[in-house]
Amino acid sequence: MTGQSRIGVTGLAVMGANLARNIARHGVPVAVHNRTGARTTEFIEAYGDEGEFTGTQSLQEFVDALERPRRIIVMVKAGKPVDGVITELTPLLDEGDIIIDAGNSHFPDTVRRTAECAANGIRFMGVGVSGGEEGALLGPSIMPGGDPEAYAEVKDVFEAIAAQVDGTPCVVHVGPGGAGHYVKMVHNGIEYADMQLIVEAYDLLTHVAGLDAPAIGKIFEEWNSGDLESFLIEITGKVLAKVDEKTGGPLVDVIVDRAGQKGTGTWTAIDALGLGIPLTGITEAVFARGLSALRDERKKASTTLAGPNPSAAEDRTDLVDDIRQALYASKVVAYAQGFAQMRAASLQNDWNLDLGAMATIWRGGCIIRAQFLNRIRDAYAEHPDLDNLLMVPYFTEAVANAQDAWRRVVVTATEQGVAIPAFSSSLSYYDGYRRERGPANLIQGLRDFFGAHTYERIDAEGSFHTRWAQDGTEVRTD
Ligand code: NBP
């Protein structure tokens, strides 16, 4: 039996429901399904008149409602539920049908599921979707990975429902296998770094500039009209301006300082460690959330461990602008690192990622959407094989101009005892990256001393070992 729905969505919690509504609102007939049937009934009751929906109560009914090849978006909780749905769907599907996992799956799972589905003649796509609840409904940034021929079957739908910036939809086929979910993972990692940089600026503005939340909210509002213009800077202004109904003071002042996380930042950092890519901005952001969670330990340490207590500066005019520049320079570094990571993963996995296209599809719909991404898109358009974004004249110059302020902020924060892990590690990365000769010569010497790991010389080919504990002579080992 062949149904009439062009595409199906199973999993009607907030993301799946909004994605299904977005698709139907674009005139595409959608079959919907949810494990708990009552949710489907409620969905049809609430939104049934927004488009051409077919509500189904069983997976058999669901697959029967779809055109061939069947195109099925799975929007269930990431992890085991995705495998469960694939297992249940597989016997009901035909050769060439397409399963699209649009949740936040970890990319190695996507690689495995692609192979498992292929063994059953099913085409599997791992698709990153960013933008949260509102993006799913009004236009997300979509990062589809998997078989390009399978993508061709859904391209028109994805392009219709994605956010649009300057007439360009925020969706592009990212690459094969796990590439889509990989890129979504790095997107989320960059989101962690962006947020950490924002909170470090907030901390300094509070404790070193001596400003209160509404005043800082206004500063973020101003910053949002310059180089920093972005969704996260914009909402920072709004969150800081919010008044708590209960206390009459700023809401942010009564929110517990313990950050949650769902794991995508950790995945990004772990992957960077495996690739050997320095990813200090994102990784420090993950560690900072970890430190924030040690609330009880911090409470004890706050009365035990010595250190300066920050005191508000008398003249804050220059300080506020210095903090803005430090935020911008650190942000450039965090993005340079994230893009370097995607480049390394692309080379390792033969994904052939178009990094300029990634910047292009992140300009709208997603959480890190920003003006700044236009600059990154331009950089890759001019230099497709770029090693590091810092080397493009625009960014080289931007960081060069900001660096005096950036260094002042790191010094001031350190003197005043304000933790700035992302600001300071970004500056250290910058200083390390711009050194032709670093100090790792000594590491090699030490490794050779205790483990005969050998070293190379700057003045001769080959590898060498010194008999440190014996006669001290050097021998060539290759
Ligand atoms: P949740 O992640 O909260 O998952 C709830 C859905 O999964 C419900 O439809 C539930 O069905 C279904 N489900 C579960 Br739980 N176990 C199942 C199983 N074994 N078999 C079949 N269905 C099962 O939903 P969400 O917040 O809409 O997110 C969906 C995906 O999108 C996740 O991967 C999430 O990480 C990702 N994502 C979320 C956001 C966001 O802002 N929330 C943003 C971007 C991406 P039930 O109704 O029967 O319990």
What would you call each of these model-derived segments?
Residues 1-70, 93-96, 133-136:
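NAD(P)+-binding Rossmann beta1-loop-alpha1 motif at the extreme N-terminus of oxidoreductases
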Residues 7, 64, 82-85, 100, ...:
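Rossmann-fold dinucleotide-binding core
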Residues 30, 55, 124-125, 279, ...:
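Hydrophobic beta-strand scaffold residues
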Residues 35-36, 104-105, 129-130, 417:
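Short, ordered loop/turn segments at secondary-structure junctions
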Residues 54-61, 78-86:
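Glycine-rich, highly charged phosphate/nucleotide-binding loops
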Residues 179, 192-415, 419-420:
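C-terminal substrate-binding/catalytic lobe of Rossmann-fold NAD(P)-dependent dehydrogenases
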Residues 400, 405-478:
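C-terminal amphipathic alpha-helical interaction region
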